[in-house]
């Protein structure tokens, strides 16, 4: 979940277990990506997948804060690509909400998504089992703020978002091909 100065992130394994999480300065993450891909003893390995939340057009004005977040998302993506180790995908907040909530326009989507994530990791024991306490931490112990958004991205990707992103890419390719066809036809 890239932000204008801080980025919330989670590292999950193939089964969705949270291995590490944090909210770090963008410059620190950029250095991590460029230097070693090691963060607090957790490592990204060749073949791992990184999914970044990316903004999509909303038909509203955009703030400087949002432009800064987009700029950092691009810088982080470029640094990750330069490693040649990981595959990078992007998913929009709208796509995450649609996958996890099942529809658009749900009131208080962030609170509902957090509740869905807690239920997913609760193993039948409710919020206390999912989050836990300092003495008895659950799988989501310590997850806070933008880390929840990053976890939502990871869970949505594991569920269905990859299919939605693929459909988006196919629609964009069809539009590009149609525009190219019209351009050639107009030039003839």
Over which residues does each language-model region extend?
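Phosphate- and other anionic-substrate recognition elements at nucleic-acid/protein interfaces
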Residues: 2-188
């Amino acid at each position: 979940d890239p932000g204008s100065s801080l980025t919330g992130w989670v590292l999950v394994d193939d089964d969705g277990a949270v291995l590490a999480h944090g909210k770090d300065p963008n410059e620190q993450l950029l250095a991590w990506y460029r230097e070693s891909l090691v963060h607090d003893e957790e490592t990204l390995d060749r073949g791992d997948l990184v999914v970044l939340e990316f903004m999509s057009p909303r038909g509203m004005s955009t703030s400087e804060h949002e432009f800064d977040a987009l700029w950092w998302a691009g810088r982080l993506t470029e640094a990750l690509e330069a490693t040649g180790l990981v595959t990078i995908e992007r998913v929009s907040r709208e796509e995450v909400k649609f996958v996890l909530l099942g529809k658009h326009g749900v009131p208080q989507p962030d609170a509902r998504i957090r509740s869905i994530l807690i239920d997913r990791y609760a193993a039948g024991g409710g919020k206390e089992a999912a989050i836990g306490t300092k003495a008895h931490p659950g799988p989501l112990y310590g997850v806070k703020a933008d880390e929840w958004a990053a976890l939502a991205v990871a869970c949505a990707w594991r569920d269905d978002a990859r299919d939605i992103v693929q459909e988006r890419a196919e629609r964009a390719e069809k539009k590009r091909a149609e525009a190219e066809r019209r351009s050639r036809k107009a030039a003839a």
